[in-house]
UniProtKB/Swiss-Prot annotation:
<keyword id="KW-0521">NADP</keyword>
<dbReference type="InterPro" id="IPR036291">
    <property type="entry name" value="NAD(P)-bd_dom_sf"/>
</dbReference>
<dbReference type="InterPro" id="IPR002347">
    <property type="entry name" value="SDR_fam"/>
</dbReference>
<dbReference type="Pfam" id="PF13561">
    <property type="entry name" value="adh_short_C2"/>
</dbReference>
<feature type="binding site">
    <location>
        <position position="41"/>
    </location>
    <ligand>
        <name>NADP(+)</name>
    </ligand>
</feature>
<feature type="active site" description="Proton donor">
    <location>
        <position position="143"/>
    </location>
</feature>
<comment type="function">
    <text>Short-chain dehydrogenase/reductase; part of the gene cluster that mediates the biosynthesis of the alkaloid (-)-FR901483, a potent immunosuppressant that shows efficacy in animal models and a probable inhibitor of purine nucleotide biosynthesis by targeting phosphoribosylpyrophosphate amidotransferase (PPAT). Within the pathway, FrzI catalyzes the formation of dephospho-(-)-FR901483 from the aza-tricyclic intermediate produced by FrzH. The biosynthesis of (-)-FR901483 starts with the condensation of two L-tyrosines to yield (S,S)-dityrosyl-piperazine.</text>
</comment>
<feature type="binding site">
    <location>
        <position position="193"/>
    </location>
    <ligand>
        <name>NADP(+)</name>
    </ligand>
</feature>
<protein>
    <recommendedName>
        <fullName>Short-chain dehydrogenase/reductase FrzI</fullName>
        <ecNumber>1.1.1.-</ecNumber>
    </recommendedName>
</protein>
<comment type="similarity">
    <text>Belongs to the short-chain dehydrogenases/reductases (SDR) family.</text>
</comment>
<feature type="active site" description="Lowers pKa of active site Tyr">
    <location>
        <position position="161"/>
    </location>
</feature>
<dbReference type="GO" id="GO:0016491">
    <property type="term" value="F:oxidoreductase activity"/>
</dbReference>
<feature type="binding site">
    <location>
        <position position="21"/>
    </location>
    <ligand>
        <name>NADP(+)</name>
    </ligand>
</feature>
<keyword id="KW-0560">Oxidoreductase</keyword>
<feature type="active site" description="Proton donor">
    <location>
        <position position="144"/>
    </location>
</feature>
<comment type="pathway">
    <text>Secondary metabolite biosynthesis.</text>
</comment>
<feature type="active site" description="Proton acceptor">
    <location>
        <position position="157"/>
    </location>
</feature>
């Protein structure tokens, strides 16, 4: 007899779950037995397709539209999850915004736009969920290679992701005993998603730079796949990861190892 799925009947929230890494995470959690609520900003059709994939796996799927500028968004997400599943066992803060801006061109509007998605949403979503957490909850934040690499024109994005890693460590300490929760972070490098797509408007120097970096990737000379990241996130949501908290897991093939 096969063992039961490792996340059987767990209730998960995956922000930004309509495409790319978020979609892969949502489907992998469902494959391991979880019911999954995914959020999206504008890609409603893609979100519905992900929900259908989750349902094909025999799990419940819920879709919630939530803009990063909507201050009531976190509460609506949590209430939808509790209404459908009764509790929250897993939160994956995957929704993010990556955009470049030189310091000389920085505006308050640009700063707020990045920070709203990459910091405000995760913080207030977790806050709203605290009183509804299950008996052994898991929180996984999605960071970025940019948090540590010092790439040109990424100071705001890098700062937001470095701060998310810092919040991960602080939450692990602050919430661990009180809620029996583990809090970890996953740090992807380049991943083969539509966000990474190259077209005629992409700077040739940028393309050449990343092509060279990919060839240097220690694990293999390729970019990551959404599935590569989803496998790591799913493990951090399982009981077997119980002794791992406050960690930032490098999921970038070794491009950055600190």
């Amino acid at each position: 007899m096969n063992p039961p799925p490792s996340l059987l009947d767990k209730a998960a929230i995956v922000t930004g779950g309509s495409r790319g890494i978020g979609a892969a995470i949502a489907i992998e959690l469902a494959r391991r037995g979880a019911h999954v609520l995914i959020t999206y900003n504008t890609a409603s059709h893609k979100a519905q397709l992900v929900a259908e994939e989750i349902q094909k796996l025999g799990r419940k799927a819920t879709v919630v539209q939530a803009s990063s500028t909507d201050r009531e968004g976190p509460n609506r997400i949590v209430q939808a999850a509790v209404s459908q599943y009764g509790r929250i066992d897993i939160i994956v803060n995957n929704a993010g915004m990556a955009d470049d801006c030189l310091l000389q061109d920085l505006t308050h509007e640009f700063w707020d736009r990045i920070m709203d998605v990459n910091l405000r949403l995760p913080a207030f979503l977790v806050q709203a969920a605290l009183q509804h957490l299950g008996p052994a909850p898991r929180i996984v934040n999605i960071s970025s290679l940019a948090a540590r690499a010092g790439y040109n024109a990424t100071s705001v994005y890098a700062a937001s992701k470095a701060a998310l890693e810092g919040m991960t460590r602080a939450w692990a300490t602050e919430l661990g005993h009180r809620y029996n929760v583990t809090v970890n972070c996953v740090n992807p490098g380049p991943v083969d998603t539509d966000i990474m797509a190259v077209d005629e408007n992409t700077d040739a120097e940028v393309v050449a730079y990343w092509n060279a970096k990919v060839k240097e990737t220690p694990a293999a000379p390729r970019v990551g796949t959404p599935g590569d990241i989803a496998q790591i996130v799913a493990f951090l949501c399982e009981e077997g990861s119980r002794w791992c908290t406050g960690s930032v897991v490098n999921a970038n093939g070794g491009l950055v190892t600190v």
